[in-house]
Amino acid sequence: MVDARDGNALDRAVGDLDGVVAVPGDVSDPDHRRRLIEAAAGWIDLLVNNASVLGPSPQPVLADYPLEELRRVYEINVVAPLALVQLALPRLADGARVVNVTSDAAVEAYETWGGYGSSKAALAQITAVLGAENAGLRFYALDPGDMRTQMQQEAFPGEDISDRPPPEESVPGLLALIEGNLASGLYRARELVEATA
């Protein structure tokens, strides 16, 4: 089961994949989150929280950050992933994995990245605490690294980001968490890829 805000893009992404249920919607909507968990039949083996929002573009310094926009960033980047985990916990199979996608901005103090970065730091801490509280499950915070995405372009308006790697280069790192037996914790996709090469 997969979701995205853009139903058309979601349908294109799912394509002809067998057994994949597309549930379009916004993870900041509690009703949509409930529909997502209900659409997952039986036990849940994997939950990947990848939905994210950058915030204003260009990103302002924290002294000028619009607080309503910061609340929106936290609602999508922090509250929604935790809410999905809360709904999924009773149905997570023993040994199930939860991957929360974070960022290097969660651990590095980049100028103007305070809103997004602090939300990803909060998500990483929530992931660590969930791992400590649920010994039979694996909770991973995954930093995919810089990628050539729309969000990256929004973060650097007017700049050429063609030198960033495409998102698919981070996939082996994600697969290492999903298929491996690593302890709960914070991981960087590039390091996981290098370790498995």
Predicted features and spans:
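Residue(s) in the substrate-gating loop at a strand-loop-helix junction
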Residues: 103
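C-terminal helical subdomain
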Residues: 137, 141-144, 149, 157-197
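Active-site helix of classical SDR
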Residues: 85, 119
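The beta1-alpha1 cofactor-binding region of Rossmann-like NAD(H)/NADP(H)-dependent oxidoreductases
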Residues: 6-8, 23-35, 67
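Conserved NAD(P)H cofactor-binding loop of Rossmann-fold oxidoreductase domains
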Residues: 50-58
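Conserved glycine-rich Rossmann-like NAD(P)H-binding loop of the short-chain dehydrogenase/reductase
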Residues: 1-12
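Substrate-binding pocket helix/loop in short-chain dehydrogenase/reductase
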Residues: 58-62, 66-71
